[in-house]
UniProtKB/Swiss-Prot annotation:
This is NAD kinase. It comes from the Bacteria. The keyword NAD applies. It comes from Clostridium botulinum (strain ATCC 19397 / Type A). Its EC number is 2.7.1.23. Belongs to the NAD kinase family. Involved in the regulation of the intracellular balance of NAD and NADP, and is a key enzyme in the biosynthesis of NADP. Catalyzes specifically the phosphorylation on 2'-hydroxyl of the adenosine moiety of NAD to yield NADP. Its main location: cytoplasm. Keywords: ATP-binding, Cytoplasm, Kinase, NAD, NADP, Nucleotide-binding, Transferase. NAD(+) binds at residues 61-62, 134-135, 145, 164, 175-180, 234. One of its GO terms (biological process) is NADP biosynthetic process. The keyword Transferase applies.
Length: 281
């Protein structure tokens, strides 16, 4: 492992001193290592990134999401040094950075392949790659009016309801927006997709888990303005068509996970149960 990328979120508190220390830690483990620095994911999606052995992300979970989308086509593994708020995906804290880099070069890690989503807009030429690691969300526009949606799974009608929107999430995204919409926490290596309605106007409409190979069609039956498509909470596009198709992408996000990290501990402390009675012994 000699070609290392570092993707920096310039909105975070990352001083030159921090970066110099990271350079030092890397060269202590491999004096011949070549390091390429990226800022705010610019240039990460270029073909040259295919040569990288790993990318370290200095930022928060949002920076991880952007990095994952940029590198998805190149099969480059990533891990995050948390400089954000939550740090669920970017799970390495700054004080543990040296240890993580040492373990990286010693090969003391595993790689988790995480499902990603793709989205096609019916009747529109594919000019953009709508890839998502967390979720793809179709919602009403700015008006405070609900929209009527009809959901088809593998071309079979599932249900129709009125709601503020619809979330289609991966297992990775199950701890994000869909969790707030009442969806379950899904273990990250499961091959499933989740549909979670946002504020449905019916008590009987609940989130559902589907086979990961399912094709999900969302048809907008009644609208007062063009709905909005949001990718990982970061990319935003007004939708002028009445049907959106969401399915599993052929690309995956490759997350580097170090052996001393426990998913359930991270879940307890950062997502699920922030109370003394659940801290354990």
């Amino acid at each position: 492992m000699k070609n290392i990328g570092i993707n920096i979120n310039t909105d975070k508190d990352i001083s030159r001193n921090i970066l110099d220390k990271i350079f030092q830690y890397i060269h202590e483990e491999c004096s011949e290592a070549k390091i390429k620095v990226f800022y705010d994911s610019k240039g990460l999606d270029n073909e040259e990134s295919r040569a990288l052995d790993a990318v370290m992300v200095l930022g928060g979970d949002g920076t991880i999401l952007g990095t994952a989308r940029a590198l998805a086509k190149y099969d480059v593994p990533i891990f995050g040094i948390n400089r954000g708020h939550l740090g669920f995906l970017a799970e390495i804290e700054l004080e543990d950075c040296k240890k993580a880099i040492k373990n990286l070069f010693k090969g003391q890690y595993k790689i988790e392949d995480r499902i990603m989503l793709k989205c096609d807009l019916k009747g529109i030429d594919k000019k953009d790659d709508f890839l998502a690691l967390n979720d793809i969300v179709l919602t009403k526009g700015n008006l405070s009016r609900i929209v009527k949606y009809s959901i088809y799974v593998d071309d079979v009608w599932y249900t129709t309801f009125v709601a503020d929107g619809v979330i289609v999430a991966t297992p990775t995204g199950s701890t994000a927006y869909s969790l707030s919409a009442g969806g379950p926490i899904v273990y990250p290596d499961l091959d499933v997709l989740e549909i979670a309605p946002i504020c449905p106007h019916s008590l009987g409409i609940r989130p559902i888990l589907l086979n990961g190979n399912s094709k999900i069609n969302i048809r907008v039956l009644k609208k007062y303005e063009d709905p909005v498509l949001t990718i990982d909470g970061q990319r935003y596009k007004k939708v002028t068509v009445n049907e959106v198709t969401i399915s599993k992408s052929e690309y995956k996000c490759r997350l580097i996970k170090f052996k001393d990290k426990d998913y359930f501990k991270i879940l307890r402390t950062k997502i699920s149960y922030r109370s003394r009675e659940c801290e354990g012994e």
